[in-house]
Regions:
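Long, hydrophobic, well-ordered secondary-structure blocks that form the structural core
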Residues: 113-192
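Alpha-helical scaffold segments in carbohydrate-active enzymes
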Residues: 155-173, 251-266, 290, 294
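Inter-helical turn/loop segments and adjacent helix faces that build the functional surface
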Residues: 138-152, 172-179, 205-212, 231-251, ...
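Alpha-helical scaffold segments that form or flank carboxylate-/histidine-based iron centers
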Residues: 34-39, 118-122, 145-161, 241-258, ...
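Amphipathic, well-ordered alpha-helical segments in soluble domains
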Residues: 129-136, 163, 225-229, 259-262, ...
């Protein structure tokens, strides 16, 4: 008996979903595209929200920033659930490896007094700022318009919980395996003068009803704080006998660089919208500059305390320079 093997090509009955084919053509689509495009609820709402009957439960007017086609914006990272979880798993495993090395070598115990104070008084309390960031981005995920926008915001909200956990793990390690320093960090967040501007800004932004303005304010503070703590101080730690700080900072800096990609792409989409671009650009210039000014005001006492603890003046200079750069990016003109 003989057998003859043949290759048979089975053509798929469809390349992608109909709504994707109408937008991009009848061709294979990525999982990101199929899971993200045209999923925004737009009709068949049963009632308007009792707390704002002038709008639908899902409405494009929850922010002054709008896109003619919300799906003109795409997350450049192409994150949907599987690649997002894979990326973040790798990120936190890398941090865990660094923390194991830090603990094994006793590097936290060897921190100079000034650097230890920076960590305990100023860095660890920012786990509460990360928690505020999570709430702010959850608001954006709920009230934003367009699945690609709200999806990116939701993943960023998850990230803020992860960032808070990173800081918490550092605090527990620095506290000898106890949560004592985390309890102290909460009191610093609630009571210490250098942190009260940040706390006020966080609480006010949590209740901001315009998700676009809330994003601008959170982003302005992030750009000053993350650059100061995880770039500028990272460089100083390398030459100041604080390698433990540098080993932690690298992971926060890498997350921030990744997070910037979806936010910068959204700003670009707002500016380049064929119909609403000019309006969005004017709003970005106005509200972006205001957000940066507020951020500089609330971060300055924080930076001044860093200078006091480390014996210098470079922290305040750094945030002032960064604020000018961010303001220019929003307005297109030098401060």
């Amino acid at each position: 008996m003989q057998y003859e093997l043949k290759t048979q090509v089975i053509e798929p009955q469809r390349q992608t979903f109909t709504h994707i084919a109408k937008r991009y053509g009848d061709k294979p689509a990525s999982r990101y595209t199929e899971g993200s495009i045209d999923v925004q609820p737009k009709e068949h709402f049963q009632y308007r929200p009792t707390w704002d009957p002038t709008r639908e439960i899902f409405d494009d007017s929850y922010s002054v920033f709008r896109l003619t086609d919300p799906y003109s914006y795409l997350d450049p990272r192409q994150y949907y659930y599987a690649p997002y979880v894979t990326a973040r798993s790798g990120h936190h495993e890398a941090f865990a490896t660094s923390l194991e090395y830090i603990e094994a070598r006793g590097l936290l115990e060897r921190l100079p007094d000034g650097w230890r104070s920076v960590l305990t008084e100023l860095v660890l309390p920012l786990r509460h700022l990360e928690s505020a960031g999570q709430l702010i981005l959850c608001g954006m995920a709920r009230f934003g318009w367009g699945g690609t926008v709200t999806q990116a915001a939701a993943y960023s909200a998850f990230d803020r919980v992860g960032n808070a956990q990173v800081l918490s793990r550092v605090g527990i390690a620095l506290g000898g395996g106890t949560a004592d320093l985390l309890a102290e960090a909460k009191e610093h967040w609630l009571q210490d003068a250098p942190l009260q501007g940040l706390r006020r800004m966080a609480e006010e932004t949590i209740v901001e009803t315009d998700w676009g303005l809330a994003l601008l304010r959170l982003d302005a503070v992030d750009r000053l704080v993350y650059d100061l703590l995880y770039q500028h101080l990272d460089d100083q730690a390398v030459v100041s006998g604080a390698p433990a700080y540098s080993l932690v900072a690298q992971h926060m800096a890498s997350w921030f660089a990744d997070n910037r990609r979806w936010i910068d792409a959204l700003y670009t989409a707002w500016r380049e919208d064929p119909e609403l671009g000019a309006t969005n650009a004017a709003l970005l210039a106005e509200h972006g500059a205001a957000a940066v000014d507020t951020a500089l005001e609330v971060v300055t006492p924080f930076a001044a305390r860093i200078d006091e603890l480390l014996g210098g003046s470079s922290a305040v200079d750094r945030i002032t320079m960064t604020a000018a750069e961010v303001r220019t990016a929003h307005t297109g003109a030098a401060a």
